[in-house]
């Protein structure tokens, strides 16, 4: 776990992230995500920051297996609060993209339109 750094920067960070409630479910989700390459966790008494480079993918089957109980989009919404990056909800996962262009195919954004 790392410490939070505050400040302002004008360059593109290529990062995305979400704040999870520090509950039994939130903790397991954070641990699963923290084991992935490029993902950093920052723990606070009531919340856990999950930050990643380019893309965070919360796979519901993977999280269901880790929890030992069903995990879906409604539970993700329940344990998460703030986020940064483009969030896309699908039936089997929630994804956060650092760049809206990377999310274009999921959100119906035409990169070639003028």
From Swiss-Prot:
SUPFAM superfamilies: Monooxygenase (hydroxylase) regulatory protein. Disulfide bonds: none annotated. Induction: By acetone. Transcriptionally activated by MimR. Belongs to the TmoD/XamoD family. GO terms for molecular function: monooxygenase activity. It comes from Mycolicibacterium smegmatis (strain ATCC 700084 / mc(2)155) (Mycobacterium smegmatis). This is Propane 2-monooxygenase, effector component. InterPro entries: MOase_MmoB_DmpM, mOase_MmoB_DmpM_sf. Gene3D superfamilies: Monooxygenase component MmoB/DmpM. Effector component of the propane 2-monooxygenase multicomponent enzyme system which is involved in the degradation of propane via the O2-dependent hydroxylation of propane. The propane 2-monooxygenase multicomponent enzyme system is composed of an electron transfer component and a monooxygenase component interacting with the effector protein MimD. The electron transfer component is composed of a reductase (MimB), and the monooxygenase component is formed by a large subunit (MimA) and a small subunit (MimC).
